[in-house]
Amino acid sequence: MNFIKTHKKDFIYCCVIVLLAVAALVLGVALASKKSAEEKSYYDKKCEVFAAENANFSRGQIVFIGDSITDGCALDTYYGALDLATYNRGIGGDTTAGVLKRLDSSLVALEPSKVVLLIGINDINGGVKKGEIIDNYDKILKKISESLPNSEVLCVSILPLNDDLESYTGISVAKSTETILAVNPEIEKLAEKYGYGFVDMFSVLADDENRLPKNLSPDGIHLSDAGYRKYSTVIKPMLCD
């Protein structure tokens, strides 16, 4: 009898342990899901902001779309004198795949008359193959041409880098530059394919060694005020027509 009672107690004890473990697991998953929802990525947060802005923004204006170089640009400072409003749809860290994914809400919904597209450097620095970059870029332009047949598009070449970037990231600037120089002509071909404009901003900004001059960048990849001013002196006249 004692033997049976002992085993019965052991069985109950094991059941309690199992139930507690299951409860802890369920609670842990719930908390993790809640934390994940609360800690949305910068990309997701920006996409939500853009979607919310769309209802209040005018159609037929100018949209700049791309990565951190666009995201960090104070458009009113460099393009404020234009007749049309300028909307910034840049997201720091974005890639060609990211832009393609958000085209509808970030661009198409605004029905812009002009689009300035600058994207690709994060793909290159992240090791994305040239073929995939070009394929994504092609899909971006195809989507724009189908959804916004009356919009003018300006495809800006990927910009140069300098060795400051390598010093704090370990990214090989020489290797990235080699890829940039291989990708930019392909972007130009795609722009021509869809009847869009192309700006070789790499050549505008690069020095004799194909590097971004230090006075134009604070960190080897992003633009300083001087960099944005040089950039805008080329882009701005193209948006005045």
Located regions from the model:
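Soluble or luminal CAZymes and related metallo-dependent hydrolases
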Residues: 42-45, 95-99, 132-136, 179-183, ...
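N-terminal Sec-pathway targeting helices
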Residues: 2-20
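Oxyanion-hole/transition-state-stabilizing segment in secreted/luminal serine hydrolases
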Residues: 71-81, 97-135, 143, 154, ...
